[in-house]
Amino acid sequence: MSFDTLELHPTLLRAVAALGFTAPTPVQGSAIPPARDGRDVLACAATGTGKTAAFMLPILHRLLAGRRRVTRALVLAPTRELAAQIDEHRRALGRYTDLGGTAIFGGVAMEPQQTALRRGVEILVATPGRLLDHLRHPYARLDGVEIVVLDEADRMLDMGFLPDVRRILGALGPARRQTMLFSATLPPAIVTLARDFLRDPVRIDVERAPAPAAGVRHTAYPVAREGKVPLLLDLLRRPEVHNVLAFTRTKHRADRLATALTRGGVAADRIHGNRSQAQRTKALAAFKAGRLRVLVATDIAARGIDVTGLSHVVNFDMPDAPESYIHRTGRTARAEAAGDAVTFVTPEEEMEFRSIERAVRRPIHRIERR
């Protein structure tokens, strides 16, 4: 199967090609056709299966026809990191369209988010708590929403957000809309939620991401957020660290890290959704040829990267889910070779790190810096 067979708008196929996507993943191949046609979807799919594009491509396809500058699609996500990543996918996949969007979440000022909501955006990605904060004010209107996505619904359940989700869905009014629910697992509370808000959904089950590659040595470095760049520069001074694929959570952090490394005398470049296809191709070619020692990447931009002899993967920023960790670190130790996966862990990321240890099925050795 190719993306061309999914009957998506030509501008979306152009973006898919520019991102280097060749064939849809199983969840994309199963979910995109019914979602494109307006059906409700209930998908059991974990992070790392390509689920974000599975709902974002149909959203963009459907919204290309119709009104602008009014919120027509709402994506709810459990964490601000995931919301930011979904919005990055939205930008990358919608790069050749005029559809606007934004992500709103806690931990940052509300004023820029208020401005975006007043101006009007077609696609709104939000965490439940911050969205409810905005819904207390008249500028936040969701009466035009036609499509709703609940992403990682089981994580929202674990974090206690389900009552907030129900309040938000109830505030959308009785108008018929398309609803898609994605969840790695389907506990009873999620099944009940689906029964209450989805109408005759297409049910999709996708196998979880594969187990960690056997040849990877996993280590972790506890570090303060401001100490990450000095730590990476220190690691790069070691002779066994030949080349590094470093992952950040956002494209802006990828830019900043590549700049900091270059200033530190390290040959580095970055790839992410805001870089042109020519820029990404040039950076990857230079990395494979050994002209770059570090390639900084976001998860979406790194899809499909295969570098022979990659010595180290560095999780400069913690992945958003254990499955993402497995996909990231599997890029080293290819073809039965050995490789190293190094994760920087800030005090705020301890809980996420423990989830990763469960995913790799063993404790990860921590190295304390002196």
How would you name each of these model-derived features?
Residues 2-370:
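Conserved helicase RecA-like core
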